[in-house]
From Swiss-Prot:
Main location: cytoplasm
Keywords tagged on the record: ATP-binding, Cytoplasm, Decarboxylase, Gluconeogenesis, Lyase, Manganese, Metal-binding, Nucleotide-binding
Species whose genome carries this gene: Coxiella burnetii (strain RSA 493 / Nine Mile phase I)
Binding site for Mn(2+): K186, H205, D242
Cofactor note: Binds 1 Mn(2+) ion per subunit.
Pfam families associated with the record: PEPCK_ATP
Listed cofactors: Mn(2+)
Protein name, UniProt field: Phosphoenolpyruvate carboxykinase (ATP)
UniProt record similarity statement: Belongs to the phosphoenolpyruvate carboxykinase (ATP) family.
Catalytic activity reported: oxaloacetate + ATP = phosphoenolpyruvate + ADP + CO2
Gene behind this protein: pckA
Length: 517
């Protein structure tokens, strides 16, 4: 176990104690909800250009190196790690012993060492707090977080005044100059996404919940497309809202908490999330008024305002944080063009195609320096920034799991209909999408009459309980059908161009869109 020398060391403090320290240290203030409110300066989202993975003998041929998985030399990592240790040795540090992964076979023990008390509270909220010594002899991973230490690009071999470095061989994650807490959780997500596939476990950027009978649903999607909102269902039990593994026998959460977007949060639309923001939770970059009352509509700090809270704050949850293999898999896509249907039933080849494509939108982007507003994107595996191995590794595992379980995969459009974004289209309302999801989870959607949507070759239902029939075929929602066809053809061309980079079976490639007839 890594030994950390510090001026003062606080080990395994309770959430209450960490909150007291954070307030006393001036790291944040208590809001009217009881949640700790903090701000993170200029870094209000992830910094993908500042994320590195150590390239060594173990990782050289296993990682898909490039703009997402940027390589860094072992020597560069070691020098910065030592500098961070020296920096922290002159300060009070907070240490918590946690774990990631709710499965007894695949969990990782985790030691989180932070400069800020609130970062340690975040780790306690988001990771899993084990009961007793649960390491089972497994070696522990270490997160070292020193947000007050700045990097120098010339001296440290990095791109800015901050860096996230993942050392897969040494089981170390280093965060320097990174006040945005989400970097910690996504770094460990990347670690699991690297480690699990060789163990026949598919790591997934998805939410998961379970019905009264134990049936499990998975919700894949980028941030802001509906994972957290749709999985927080008043009639189902939450497993988790963001990161899961799918083994031959179960679906299990990687985390012990939730990290919900707060922009425009309302009690009426999202009561479970609203009620979870209380003492013990963290509000990150949420604007408060002079009385400490949060204004969730105020985006002056960022569109990516967040709340972190433990799973225990969701009353309807699966206690053991895992479930059986899924009965339904939903790919949430936010279509800005308004040409995709609100729901389609996918074959396993289509599932692989749309999984690899990851077509969606960046909504209130989670990344630093992104343009304001909404832009379309293709994000492989519905989470390209977090998957170190080649994308086909994950797609092949997905197809294997679909074949083994016979689960139905659905494409669900949480984006626009009747026209494009900013051009007369309207976004599907949350109640409409919830009705679609309810129809999917009831099992009735796949039993009813269907038709094929030309061009995309998608099988779509002709009716869905609680949804206007005319919404189900996107071509019928546009006043000008020729305008729909032209916009659809444009998107189809984007799909094709994006997919050229993948080396896949012909059956998967042919499952994609063809020309509009």
């Amino acid at each position: 176990m890594e030994q950390i020398a510090a001026r003062v060391t606080y080990i395994n403090l309770s959430p209450d104690e960490l909150i007291q320290h954070a307030v006393k240290n001036g790291e944040g203030v208590l809001s009217s909800t009881g949640a700790l409110a903090v701000t993170t300066g200029k870094r209000t989202g992830r910094s993908p250009k500042d994320r590195f993975i150590v390239k060594d003998e173990q990782t050289a041929d296993q990682v898909a190196w490039g703009n997402i998985n940027q390589p860094v030399e072992q020597r560069t990592f070691d020098q910065l790690w030592e500098r961070a240790l020296r920096y922290l040795s002159e300060r009070a540090v907070y240490i918590s012993h946690l774990q990631v992964g709710a499965d007894d076979n695949y969990f990782l023990p985790l030691k989180v060492v932070t400069e800020f008390a609130w970062h340690n509270l975040f780790a306690c909220d988001l990771f899993i707090r084990p009961s007793g010594d649960h390491a089972n002899g497994k070696p522990s991973w270490v997160i070292l977080s020193a947000p007050g230490l700045k990097t120098d690009p010339e001296r440290d071999g990095v791109n800015s005044d901050g860096a996230v470095m993942i050392n897969l061989s040494q089981r170390r994650v280093l965060l320097v100059g990174m006040p945005y807490a989400g970097e910690m959780k996504k770094a460990m997500f990347s670690v699991l996404n690297y480690l699990l596939p060789p163990h026949d476990v598919l790591p997934m950027h998805c939410a998961a919940n379970a019905g009264q009978s134990g049936d499990v649903a998975l919700f894949f999607g980028l941030s802001g497309t509906g994972k957290t909102t749709l999985s927080a269902d008043p009639h189902r039990f939450l497993i988790g809202d963001d990161e899961h593994g799918w083994s031959a026998t179960s679906v299990f959460n990687f985390e012990g908490g939730c990290y919900a977007k707060c922009i425009d949060l309302s009690q009426e639309r999202e009561p479970m999330i609203w009620n979870a923001i209380r003492h013990g939770a963290i509000m990150e970059n949420v604007v408060l008024d002079e009385n400490g009352v949060p204004d969730y509509a105020d985006a002056r700090l960022t569109q990516n305002s967040r709340a972190a809270y433990p799973r225990e704050y969701i009353p309807l949850r699966v206690e053991n944080n895992r479930g059986r293999p899924p009965d339904a898999v939903l790919f949430l896509t936010c279509d800005l063009d308004g040409v995709l249907p609100p729901v389609a039933l996918l074959t396993k080849e289509q599932a692989a195609y749309y999984f690899l494509s990851g077509y969606t939108a960046l909504v209130g982007s989670t990344e630093v320096g992104s343009v304001k507003g909404v832009t379309s994107t293709f994000s492989t595996c519905f989470g390209a920034p977090f998957f170190p191995r080649p994308p086909t590794v994950y797609a092949e595992l997905l197809m294997k799991r679909i074949e083994a379980t016979g689960c139905q995969v659905y494409l669900v459009n949480t984006g626009w209909t009747g026209g494009a974004y900013g051009e007369g289209g309207e976004r599907f309302s949350i109640p409409t999408t919830r009705a679609i999801v309810n129809a999917v989870l009831s099992g009735k959607l796949k039993e009813g009459p269907t038709e094929v949507l030309s061009g995309f070759n998608l099988t779509i239902p002709k009716s869905a309980l609680g949804v206007d029939d005319h919404l189900l075929n996107p071509r019928k929602t546009w006043e000008d059908v020729s305008a729909y066809d032209a916009r659809a053809q444009r998107l189809i061309q984007k799909f094709r161009e994006n997919f050229e980079k993948f080396k896949v079976l012909a059956a998967i490639r042919e499952a994609g869109p063809s020309d509009v007839h």
